[in-house]
Curated annotation (Swiss-Prot):
Pfam families: BacA
Molecular function terms, GO-annotated: undecaprenyl-diphosphatase activity
Listed name of the protein: Undecaprenyl-diphosphatase
Family: Belongs to the UppP family.
Main location per the UniProt record: membrane
InterPro entries: UppP
General function of this protein: Catalyzes the dephosphorylation of undecaprenyl diphosphate (UPP). Confers resistance to bacitracin.
Cellular compartments annotated: Cell inner membrane
Misc. remarks from the entry: Bacitracin is thought to be involved in the inhibition of peptidoglycan synthesis by sequestering undecaprenyl diphosphate, thereby reducing the pool of lipid carrier available.
One GO CC annotation: plasma membrane
Amino acid sequence: MADPSASLGLWEACWRDLVLGIVQGLTEFLPISSTAHLKVVPVLLDWGDPGVSVTAAIQLGSIVAVIAYFRRDLAQVMQGISKAFRHGQWREPEARLGIAMAVGTLPILAVGLAIKLFWDEGYETSPLRSVPSIAVVSIVMALLLAVAERMGPRRKQLSDVSGRDGLVVGLAQVLALIPGVSRSGSTLTASLLDGWQRADAARFSFLLGIPAITIAGIVELKDALAATADAGPLPLVIGILAATVVSWLAIDWLLKFLQRHSTWLFVAYRLLFGVGLLAWWSIHGAH
């Protein structure tokens, strides 16, 4: 795998990973695709594609933030699962949420493992990671979110969750392996179409993402450290810390925002982002 940091000195690498950490934190939990922005921002700044390993490792900051933010929810889920095993109380909301999280994680684990085993290097250089592909995907996902916002009945709450909900949203999460889709965007869109209230859909999306993002970050951490070997681990540490702080702020803001507002802001942003990227690419012809 090419070393995207080979031409960067220590401070340049620190600055790059600080920016990537901020971008990661802002975009991981908003339905606008962190992968797209982590690919596009370095290209626009002439840093080159940092690669899957570096971006996945920086996502560890986001997972620290989401675990810390939802620590009480996760503790309740663990207690609910424990009670269910001891007393057979599988219909309790906390136990059902735990089951939904487990069921929803299986599809992306299976597909992600298949990619890692059989298409790892090809995925890094895939046309799916090109600027025009990301632009088109962003536009398509904006239109799907618009349909979900317009048509979703918004009746379900998190306390209504079932294993079936976990499977539906988990299958949508698999789409996030396509650069530009947005894990948060695909799961939020599926949840809205399935009748969830906005804030509860976002909350479930965040909780469902914890296992997948954690495993991806840990798996790629070794390669990420190797990719930044010339500059040492400091740049990656800075990126992870920045992602942690900004992710916490983004989670808190989005949950409060969706209690009072619709997702049309994100539909508009994704459309403009996609169209803007296509316009930029048509002028510069960059990939």
